[in-house]
């Protein structure tokens, strides 16, 4: 895994990724091909915080790094306004689930995805575009934007906990049991000091309780 700590480092730091370890929004996960164990594919997750306002940066980044799959959070654009044409010109198929001003998730891929799912199967939180998935080369890629929760006293904190519980139920259901899963996104959760760039400043933050 390659990590730049949100752009703090000029050169990405290489970190060994272990099963269930926490991924930060701009981490680059390197997937080794099982046939020969030599070549690798890039799967990247990025909280873009408005895709239209970051479009020039996004296109430059795609041209430079050329990931196989890019998962975006906080696209903040309605479905009919998603910039799919520009991304197609850059060589990427786009799959998106959005809304005006807030939230929004998307998956960009060099190869077409199949069985695209938007939102929860049980229609939980259907007014918020926070979950999308699709099948890529026999793997279900799940892209999620978890609520931030503000603070433990906020009415939004129980919403975050419920969302995480619903997400666990979703991926544990029979409809997700047939294929390997890679779940990425912005979880608004940091599990240990290695998951934040300033542990002292972040201590006690709603997303960081070591």
Regions found by a protein language model. Name each.
Residues 75-78, 82-151, 155:
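Structured beta-strand-rich core segments of catalytic domains in phosphoester-bond hydrolases
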Residues 46-47, 62-80, 141, 170-193:
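Active-site beta-strand/loop signature of hydrolases that rely on acidic residues for catalysis
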Residues 1-105:
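N-terminal, active-site-proximal structural segment of metallo-dependent hydrolase catalytic domains
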Residues 140-159, 197-210:
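Active-site-proximal loop/helix segment associated with metal-binding centers of metalloenzymes
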Residues 45-51, 119-122, 158-161:
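Short, flexible loop segments at the rims of nucleotide/cofactor-binding pockets, characterized by
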Residues 57-60, 84-87, 122, 156, ...:
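Short, glycine/charged-enriched secondary-structure capping and boundary segments
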Residues 59, 156-168:
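Conserved CoA-thioester-binding segment of acyl-CoA-metabolizing enzymes
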Residues 90-91, 163-210:
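Metal-dependent phosphoesterases centered on the DNase I-like endonuclease/exonuclease/phosphatase
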């Amino acid at each position: 895994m390659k990590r730049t700590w949100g752009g703090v480092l000029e050169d990405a730091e290489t970190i060994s990724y272990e099963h269930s370890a926490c991924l930060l929004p701009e981490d680059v996960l390197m997937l080794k091909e099982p046939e020969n164990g030599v070549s690798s594919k890039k799967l990247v997750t990025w909280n873009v915080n408005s895709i239209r306002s970051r479009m020039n940066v996004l296109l430059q980044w795609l041209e430079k790094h050329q990931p196989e799959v890019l998962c975006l959070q906080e696209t903040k654009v309605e479905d009919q306004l998603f910039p799919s044409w520009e991304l197609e010109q850059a060589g990427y198929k786009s799959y998106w689930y959005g809304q005006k001003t807030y939230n929004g998730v998307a998956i960009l891929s060099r190869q077409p995805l199949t069985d695209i799912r938007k939102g929860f199967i049980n229609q939980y939180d259907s007014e918020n575009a926070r979950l999308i998935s699709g099948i890529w080369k026999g793997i279900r890629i799940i892209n999620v934007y978890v609520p931030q929760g503000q603070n433990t006293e906020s009415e939004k904190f129980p919403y975050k906990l419920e969302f995480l519980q619903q997400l666990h139920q979703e991926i544990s259901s029979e409809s997700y049991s047939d294929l390997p899963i890679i779940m990425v996104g912005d979880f608004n959760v940091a599990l240990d000091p290695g998951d934040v760039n300033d542990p002292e400043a972040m201590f006690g933050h709603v997303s960081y309780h070591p």
